[in-house]
Amino acid sequence: MFFACYCALRTNVKKYRYQDEDAPHDHSLPRLTHEVRGPELVHVSEKNLSQIENVHGYVLQSHISPLKASPAPIIVNTDTLDTIPYVNGTEIEYEFEEITLERGNSGLGFSIAGGTDNPHIGDDPGIFITKIIPGGAAAEDGRLRVNDCILRVNEVDVSEVSHSKAVEALKEAGSIVRLYVRRRRPILETVVEIKLFKGPKGLGFSIAGGVGNQHIPGDNSIYVTKIIDGGAAQKDGRLQVGDRLLMVNNYSLEEVTHEEAVAILKNTSEVVYLKVGKPTTIYMTDPYGPPDITHSYSPPMENHLLSGNNGTLEYKTSLPPISPGRYSPIPKHMLVDDDYTRPPEPVYSTVNKLCDKPASPRHYSPVECDKSFLLSAPYSHYHLGLLPDSEMTSHSQHSTATRQPSMTLQRAVSLEGEPRKVVLHKGSTGLGFNIVGGEDGEGIFVSFILAGGPADLSGELQRGDQILSVNGIDLRGASHEQAAAALKGAGQTVTIIAQYQPEDYARFEAKIHDLREQMMNHSMSSGSGSLRTNQKRSLYVRAMFDYDKSKDSGLPSQGLSFKYGDILHVINASDDEWWQARRVMLEGDSEEMGVIPSKRRVERKERARLKTVKFNAKPGVIDSKGSFNDKRKKSFIFSRKFPFYKNKEQSEQETSDPERGQEDLILSYEPVTRQEINYTRPVIILGPMKDRINDDLISEFPDKFGSCVPHTTRPKRDYEVDGRDYHFVISREQMEKDIQEHKFIEAGQYNDNLYGTSVQSVRFVAERGKHCILDVSGNAIKRLQVAQLYPIAIFIKPRSLEPLMEMNKRLTEEQAKKTYDRAIKLEQEFGEYFTAIVQGDTLEDIYNQCKLVIEEQSGPFIWIPSKEKL
């Protein structure tokens, strides 16, 4: 039969091993890693501000809660700096202002970040305004702006102090607070006209703003928020993120709604005339501009409970409001519905419109956010709601009617020391809060309130509350596990006795902080430097396994199912157990967001499963389910044109020692980055029925699929043509040298002649617009990746023996069993390199799935492995 006839050839064959075959796979590709640490937000009341600041020595951003403004007159100080900084040869001009605010019961109404111990922008040690709280003293006064730098608080110089010193200066400034601030001078606008030709990908940009949907508070203009790769705007090159759209053809976009602007743009013809307003100067290397978030930087975001158009409640995440003279990052969720093309993935922008209007926010309400700094500590968490810092939205528009959270800071303070009864009704997100504690009898504390969850909507719980009892079960001395079990098993209606204990909670935080510091010191002293922080991370990964949320009983809230090969946008990877993510579709991020198991959780559970499997398995029996962690020594697998086999001795050695060469690697998620390619991707199909699939693709689509010409040292026969049948190599030594230099993706020897498929042969086909069908082993996948010819690698995974025998009726049951086992081993060996795994009960079903995968993965934008660490 098919396989048996080649077994007789084994003794005549020897294999060329590449030097890197036995080395661990590190995807030796040219990749960049961008790990830019972004600021974090802590929302606290004025009363316990100093306590939490003492605990959070590493906090990057603090909240000064809102109150009323003073009627103090405006005092403008026009002093200038002694030395004017230069950027790209241009002077950066600043203006200075002294602003007097009257503090009320809750604070000054703005947030700050920065300091000498944790600079907010570049290496600048200044204290910067990061948010103006609506309704607060600063907002009502109207002069303080986001990105203003505070130089002095009353008579205290804070131009070069630590973050905690600045907070202390603000806290102790008294009821009348004089702020001396520095800001960039507003940049004027230049009007230009741009002519665009739509083309197949449309105009290629996204917009935000409009009447009732202001992108910049107080400004009804329509702004460009994204330039899409391959679209008309990108090809033209003049339209930029941050440009203000003034006119489309003969239609003015001044004082129009968001919907009207969208309709005007969508109803244009092939030629579109735009009139746009541009900043006169953009400092491309401005040290005071925020870091590039195109890669892994995550700006501080806050959850807002919004009222949707259909009357239902939804969540929306907003960035700190944009100030004049500043660049502002634009989050993807603001760009979903109004793209005029189908972008393959969300692209984040860092340049925004610069205007001279005050930037105090008017349409956003703060929601208390847990910094989740405990997530990396050696204390377990029980998540009753979604993880903090979520991005949840179902509309691209930026503003709808906001709903004030019912829990106010003033009320939180008044609840201190009073045990109180809280009745909650579980919703789709559980109870909507997280707990920590339960070690050494320290108590169970609320560490996070999910915006819009039952706890938040009730307004009766807050961060720092100690849970005394749940449905009559005393939790004052309970362990974390006991508290989690009590909450999880409490039914739909849960009665909680809680007591606000800020001092106890602060001591608990301090304890965790000390433990983290000890862990950090130990990690650094041991040289590992691998201690992971709790900072919110955003990245893209490729799933290396199937996940069904309905089968995971441990989900803390709404889960997200996915398949092997799916690209996931991980919005928050700060938690050790659960990540927040969306699937990345062809048109961008999916609206559906949920939690997925973290890399750590996946690997831990799989190792536990494998231990059980090995414990229960009989000696010498291989798990037929084929767990995805098995990794064996790489070997050449049969190719119809090149039968590259191991020699008999090698085969017997590996058969007798099945665990030899196995690496303890569990496939969970692979970090990826998006890349544009200018070639047609090669196609490698592995698994049963691959030959028939390959033949059908070339037969049905000869204009889209082809094969490359292999090399050989075998003498040319009379009927053969050099360059058509083979590239006939005269010098065996030269071909051996080329093999050693990795110029071949696969090579071997048969009857004393060398055969091989060269990278150049594959590239020749790929650059001529055809998918090169390759009948090679899984080893070739990585070698093509190294050559930056990223193949579409599809693995056909049989469901069971029956479909195999049905699709190939010549197979006996024994042969089908061997084919099935070979497929499982193939997945174990090369699973990390597959683009997709397909399954089907019929050949037609498998063929159609393969065609769909190839169509979706053809490019020009593809996801490739990156070196970012998980």
UniProtKB/Swiss-Prot annotation:
Record gene name: DLG2
Q: Which keywords, in A-to-Z order, does the entry hold?
A: Cell membrane, Cell projection, Lipoprotein, Membrane, Palmitate, Phosphoprotein, Repeat, SH3 domain, Synapse
Give every PDZ domain span: 98-184, 193-279, 421-501
Protein name stated in the entry: Disks large homolog 2
What residue stretches are annotated with the Guanylate kinase-like domain?
680-855
Location, primary (coarse class): membrane
Q: Which SUPFAM superfamilies match?
A: P-loop containing nucleoside triphosphate hydrolases, PDZ domain-like, SH3-domain
> Which PROSITE patterns has this protein been placed in?
GUANYLATE_KINASE_1 (PS00856), GUANYLATE_KINASE_2 (PS50052), PDZ (PS50106), SH3 (PS50002)
Family in the record: Belongs to the MAGUK family.
Q: PANTHER family per the record?
A: DISCS LARGE (PTHR23119), DISKS LARGE HOMOLOG 2 (PTHR23119:SF6)
